[in-house]
UniProtKB/Swiss-Prot annotation:
Record organism: Humulus lupulus
Residue ranges, annotated region (SBD2): 353-429
Key word Coiled coil present: no
Keywords: ATP-binding, Cytoplasm, Ligase, Nucleotide-binding
Binding annotation for ATP: 216-224, 352-357, 449, 461-464, 556
Gene Ontology CC terms: cytosol
Protein name per the record: Probable CoA ligase CCL13
Family under the similarity heading: Belongs to the ATP-dependent AMP-binding enzyme family.
Region (SBD1): 284-352
Description of its domains: Both substrate-binding domains (SBD1 and SBD2) are involved in the substrate recognition, and are sufficient to confer the substrate specificity.
Lineage summary: Eukaryota, Viridiplantae, Streptophyta, Embryophyta, Tracheophyta
GO molecular function: ATP binding; CoA-ligase activity
CDD domains: ttLC_FACS_AEE21_like
Gene3D superfamilies: 3.30.300.30, N-terminal domain of ligase-like
Length: 573
């Protein structure tokens, strides 16, 4: 596909000039060569190949009554890759889409598609038919694998494509159910039955070849197509499982959607370590606790909103203390210190990370220091809520002035833009060179997140650029206001956005969901007073709205929807 070939054409994206090459390099040292003996393109495909031998009979995946070993998973992926090429004619650079929740077939497609030379495009299972249609057209997918529960949405999406005279992708059902045997669609299990495990893997010729497309999560109205490389996926997979403390005996619960940042690269990372994957379609506190007890889950990932569900669930009282230590990797938005504290009281060990779709998921890690244990709980958990240091595979991270590109002072108060530079930054936005150039301007990836740098080098997010409330000329960090709101005993969830104001320009408007039992016992005035007692008055919300908060599939609150609601309220003054 010509669009993907262009990904390998050098483009001058960075304004800053690269450093001059050293006067002496390995190429000028006599007797050294680079050849196939010492240079092989990196690809996470190799993780599965190794695990099929090293951990042959170990359990690779469990889903209800379904259970596979690593040898079986490797066998199935080879047969599927074979069928993709022989049955559908998938060629290197072709896009294969998926539309499903976390089931075994989606895990297998993370290997089978790149084994066939294809590019995996995992679509958000909560998208409606219009969005699915738009993303299929944009990605130019040749195939789409769909689970039966989402078939009607997928059909409607394909119909929309046909109405626009766009050739729709071939639909493959992810089922072996007898009720679908008479359907006109290809079936996943039929492909497996007709595939060959003698298939010769189509390895990337260049480790920077695309392995997947991930559309941004939808906290903005127009998702972008982020392209991951084999190299970036390989490096971030290893770094993530190492920093999460995962090994051969680890049991990983799939609470992070695999359609989001390829599940933070854990499909490939779990294979690298030969860990066991536990798949679940629906995430709930009950499902998490049940699997911890049933399958001895040792690790899982979740957005702070899921942690908030856990600590406020009756299930927590029934199942804690936990029977063994469970490591939780959380990211997506700054977690309230109070939530981290309660999680650890229940027996979870919280590992706070921060990243974006554009950084293959995790890009930082809040490394906990032994001396923090001696601090008062409030101070200790505030430190753990920071975003921390650069991730193991991310070479550089900084907080910089977005205009001068100078590093801000490490004083914990000077605000700048969080920026990254490294091998796990995306290749770019597919079909959007302008956005790619803007994101990489100055030789760094600009996140759009505002933060500070502390004396110890740890960074801490203050807000998204677009979320800062400017009231009377003062910048109000919505994250700081939300942290105070979460400390109120009645508040389950909170989000702060700007409400237009004729006098002040903008004022903070808080959308709040109350805990069960507090529905009629707390007023907006009480919430406002609580905040004014703990914040400068200009930072305290002037408006409080009680309602359920809209979220993405990964649990991130959709502030753009709340902003529209606040805008519709008009001026408070």
């Amino acid at each position: 596909m010509d669009n993907y070939r262009r990904l390998h054409t050098p483009v001058a994206l960075c304004v800053a000039s690269p450093p001059a090459p050293p006067t002496t390099s390995w190429k000028s040292m006599e007797g050294l060569v680079q050849c196939s003996a010492n240079h092989v393109p990196l690809s996470p495909i190799t993780f599965l190949e190794r695990s099929s031998k090293a951990y042959r009979d170990n359990t690779s995946l469990v889903y209800g009554s379904v259970r596979y070993t690593w040898a079986q998973t490797h066998h199935r992926c080879l047969k599927l890759a074979s069928a993709l090429t022989t049955h559908f004619g998938i060629s290197p650079g072709d896009v294969v889409a998926t539309f499903s929740y976390n089931i075994p077939e989606i895990y297998e497609l993370h290997f089978a598609v790149p084994m066939a030379g294809g590019i995996l495009c995992t679509l958000n299972a909560r998208n409606d038919s219009a969005m699915v249609s738009t993303l299929l057209a944009h990605s130019e997918a040749k195939l789409i694998f769909v689970e039966p529960q989402l078939l009607e949405t997928a059909r409607a999406a394909l119909d929309l494509l046909a109405q626009k005279d766009i050739k729709p992708p071939t639909l493959v059902l992810l089922t072996d159910s007898e009720s679908f045997t008479s359907s006109s669609y290809d079936h996943y299990n039929h492909l497996l039955a007709n595939g060959s495990d003698d298939f010769e893997i189509r390895r990337p010729k260049n480790e920077c070849d695309p392995i997947s497309i991930n559309y941004t999560s939808g906290t903005t109205a127009r998702p972008k197509a982020v392209v991951y490389s084999h190299r970036g996926a390989y490096l971030n997979s290893i770094a993530t499982v190492l920093l999460h403390g995962m090994g051969t005996r680890s049991v990983y619960l799939w609470s992070v959607p695999m359609f989001h940042c390829n599940g933070w690269c854990f499909p490939w990372g779990a294979a690298a370590q030969g860990a066991t994957n536990i798949c679940i379609r629906k995430v709930s506190p009950k499902a998490i606790f049940d699997n911890i007890h049933l399958h001895k889950v040792t690790h899982f990932g979740a957005a702070p909103t899921v942690l908030n569900m856990i600590v406020n669930s009756p299930e927590g009282n029934l199942h804690t203390p936990l029977p063994h230590k469970v490591e939780v990797m959380t990211g997506g938005s700054p977690p309230p210190p109070k939530v981290i504290a309660r999680m650890e009281e229940m027996g979870f060990q919280v590992n706070h990370i921060y990243g974006l779709t554009e950084t293959h998921g995790p890009a930082t890690n809040c490394v906990c220091k032994p001396e923090w244990d001696a601090l008062q709980p409030e101070e200790r958990y505030a430190l753990k809520a920071r975003q921390g240091l650069n991730h193991l595979a991310m070479e550089e991270m900084d907080v910089r002035d977005p205009v001068s590109m100078e590093s801000v002072r490490a004083d914990g108060t000077t605000i700048g833009e969080v920026m990254f530079r490294g091998n796990t930054v995306m290749s770019g936005y597919f079909k959007d060179l302008k956005a790619t150039e803007e994101a990489f301007e100055g030789g760094w990836f600009r996140t759009g997140d505002l933060g500070v740098k502390h004396e110890d080098g740890y960074i801490q997010l203050k807000d998204r650029k677009k979320d800062v409330v400017i009231s009377g000329g003062e910048n109000v960090s919505t994250v700081e206001v939300e942290t105070v709101l979460y400390s109120h005993e009645a508040v389950l969830e909170a989000a702060v956005v700007a409400r237009p104001d004729k006098l002040w320009g903008e004022t903070p408007c808080a959308f709040v969901t109350l805990k069960e039992g507090f529905d009629n016992g707390v007023s907006a005035d009480q919430i406002i007073k609580f905040c004014r007692d703990r914040l400068p008055h200009y930072m305290a919300p002037k408006t409080v709205v009680f309602e359920e908060l809209p979220k993405t599939s990964t649990g991130k609150i959709q502030k753009y929807i709340l902003k529209e609601k606040a805008k519709a309220m008009g001026s408070l003054s």
